[in-house]
Amino acid sequence: MSRPNASAQKSFITQALKAERDVSSATSQRQALEAAIDAAEHYMKALNLASVQKDKHALDAKCKEWLTRAEKIKESKDWQAAARFHDKTVPEPRLPVSTRKLTTREEIILLEGAKLNGFIFPPWSTSPGSDEFKREDGESPFTDKPDLHLSYPQRKVFDGWKRPSELLAKDTEDVYTKVVPVMSVPGKTDLVQDMLTDCSVVASLCATTSMLERGQCTHFLPMIYPSRGSSQPSPSGKYIFRFYFNGCFRKVIIDDRLPSSKTSRSLHVIDRKNPNFLWPALVEKAYLKLRGGYDFPGSNSGTDLWVLTGWIPEQVFLHNDDVTGDQLWKRLYRSFHQGDVLLTIGTGELTEREQRELGLVSEHDYAILDMKESKGRRQLLVKNPWAGADTAPGDNGSLSASQDLPHNPPSFEPGTFWMDCEKLLQHFENLYLNWNPEIFKYREDVHFTWDLNNGRGVAGCFVNNPQFAVSTENGGIVWLLLGKHFRTTGQPERPLDEYQANEESAFISIYVFNADGKRVSLSDGALHRGPYVDSPNTLMRLEMPPRTTYTVVVSEQSLPSLNQNFTLSAFSTCPVRMAKAQDKYMCVRKIQGSWTPSTAGGNAESSRYPLNPQFRLEIENDTDVSLLLECPNTELATHVKLFWSNGNRVSRVRSRDIIADSGDYRRGGSLVEKKALEPGSYTIVCSTFAPDQLGRFTLWVSSLVPCKTSPLPPEAAGRRTVISDIGVLPPGRDRMLASLQVPRLTRIKLITRSRQSIIGSHPVGPSPVLMTVELGQGPYKQILATSEDGTHSDAVSGVRVEDFDLQPGLEESGGIWIVIERIGGPGGQVEDHFEVEALAEERVEIGEWILEDA
């Protein structure tokens, strides 16, 4: 079937289903007959376009069924019975279903998700039969316990839980007029909230009823039993809803008792046009049951519709630079009129002045009931679900300006108004889209637990984050939906602000990497990065090339430190697979360390860099290696280097010795990866940007084959430290020496450090120096040890004479001398100040500095 024919066939079927609902809600025999004939005619038109034999048989049967029913309505004395729908006449939605076999742990996660706010919501299995709602003679109506919680202001006007007939009798002034509750009504509805703070829920209900009224929905949303397709209430007062939350569709059972009020204010959603319309209040009660009670402050309508319908939620931040009216309109207009997307919208925080001038409510959700375009002008019909709303925003002029547009209603309900698309983008903050999952053919779900008490990573570091491989052979559109499972909100008397703080202070996001399904360590280099949202869901839309595997990372900010369950769902036009991301490296070692006052040496330009924590890495076979430095203090910028140093401590930084490093200093985590590292002993140095920055860190050493990693002791470990006086080389003098005495045979290391270099009063860089250890002086002196292989050096970390042995009693041979010789500065004008640190097994003595000519 061609695409235009398929679209037309769907339109005829949708109109036929709307006519079916009109039959059940008809108030006269003539209305019912006309609607039945209308249903038959639309099924006939759809049949003429059908090309699949199975569809032809089904549509032919529906056409004959409604011709027969029209005849019965016309001839029967009890036309209401003939007009009444049966549950089987309303088709179940054909949703994509995940076929992946769940693990035992995933099944446990779904069972854990059934317990919520003191109730049990089991996963949906099969549709309930009519026997479940029967009520025998003399049997009391079904009563669900315990009663839902009310807030303190609500309890002040609360007048008890009452059945719909009691509520309607109370609100009916004429005692001779009996108003009966119904589950469907003909024509338009006008749903509003009053005392409840659930604007997001009521806006969601307005969006779904509007879609039904436009005939753009092929099934009742949300799904309710026993009244799908019937206007008659449940005989027993029991209702079962099919809601999607905590990883699957679940069964939500309620009774029909609603909270009544002592005043004219209502404690539940009402239809101002049809006060006896029971369906909205029951949907609201069922939803509030799983969200903790009637004191629910509201979330956002995208989340609410996700639960009510199972339609895929997407949040669009209207003030983002990349969101334009043209792009948004083109994306939504056709889908909206095909019934494939529900639209709601929310304001941000507005001042009282802005609320007065704009006629909008701060941090409030609205429903979008219609979209239209005429003469280049794009408008949306917006409804405020609050009962006290004005007709329209005060100064946008949209009402008077839209009268010349086609199909404009002759009148508006209070709180309903047309608004230009560009003004809507300007005055509202968030647009919530809920997409019909039937637009996708394939789905795959993964359920998992994130232990945030022990497995929380630092910002920008993903080593502890849940990661998954998402692959597709054919490529195409793939949508990834991350859902955080609802948890019990707390004690019944919890403060409202505490409830909201728990809901709004935590954020989740999705990152996507082109990493072939292998785990990644840092957030850098993401192919796609989703925004951090305070909703329990976030959507990532992808276009995947054929034969591609992406790595998907779940990220969070400020979630409570406990076990949190999630579901990650992939929706696709082609088969898609999800699995846990594989570790790139087979062997992983985790080492704890810290920067202390004695080991916080700063970056490689600091003279104290060699004091930083260092580790020996020993490798016996060629291997790829990854070094990840993770620091929980996100104020510290960190860095990691890998040196060729034969496994010894690094005392000076030379570019020829650096094998790899992590690049710029980075907050949170630093990563260096080296492929095909040859066997040998190497040294790892972990540093912060500045000296004296203290903190803990974790070093993750990963490799393809086993390797050995061990901390290197500090340079002064097991040694006595002696520091000389400051020696000064004034201009024109380039050599000085000091005596060195040892009490017994000892091993010693010497380090010369510059303390100041000036020309006049202006600081300059130190002069390159050479340090030697000499036996005696004069023509017969003997050089025992030298620094830097006999070359002059101005290394910021100091000039070193590595370990050598000295014995006492050499005074008769001229004594032992530490000699510092420099290459003079420009014109011989530099004054250099140096000190020498001796690290020896025994305490040594360094004499006063003596100046000599070079």
From Swiss-Prot:
Pfam families: PalB_C, Peptidase_C2. Residues 2-83 form the MIT domain. One of its GO terms (biological process) is proteolysis. The active site is at 199, 364, 384. It comes from the Eukaryota. The keyword Hydrolase applies. Residues 118-437 form the Calpain catalytic domain. This is Calpain-like protease palB/RIM13. PROSITE patterns: CALPAIN_CAT. It comes from Aspergillus oryzae (strain ATCC 42149 / RIB 40). GO terms for molecular function: calcium-dependent cysteine-type endopeptidase activity. Its EC number is 3.4.22.-. SMART domains: calpain_III (SM00720), CysPc (SM00230), MIT (SM00745). Required for the proteolytic cleavage of the transcription factor pacC in response to alkaline ambient pH. Probably is the signaling protease that mediates the first proteolytic cleavage within the signaling protease box of pacC. Belongs to the peptidase C2 family. PalB/RIM13 subfamily. The keyword Signal does not apply. Keywords: Hydrolase, Protease, Thiol protease. InterPro entries: Calpain_cysteine_protease (IPR022684), Calpain_III (IPR022683), Calpain_III_sf (IPR036213), MIT_dom (IPR007330), MIT_dom_sf (IPR036181), PalB/RIM13_Calpain-like (IPR051297), Papain-like_cys_pep_sf (IPR038765), Peptidase_C2_calpain_cat (IPR001300). The gene is palB. SUPFAM superfamilies: Calpain large subunit, middle domain (domain III), Cysteine proteinases, MIT domain.
